[in-house]
């Protein structure tokens, strides 16, 4: 090896680059997906979707109180009040479950490809928490990071288009 860097160090740098280059697109994707989900829930259940959705679908009876508990905890911790969106406390897995629960509505956005949507979200969920909590790059397989990045790109195609 004529390089002054060891193979191990080069491998580390490659993983670190992949790790860092995945975080920003993931963060942007997650925020965009939250907006799509919120807009969808408002369209399905109206402006009072936080109270009306649980009356119509049992899934929300379980998940909304959990999200609300996180919201209350953050408001108490950071002394912030005001109008905070409940979905700000959702993870991509929760957003995936909401979209699948409301697939009849969201299928148009994702062009009816539920399998691609689910597989892509599963790939994203696999790396999201380690990335969000700044785990060491070498603990996340590079193949998982690349798969998540591809999944984000695949789903962004749907999110970037105007919807009727």
Task: Indicate where each model-derived feature is located.
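Amphipathic alpha-helical interface elements
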Residues: 1-164
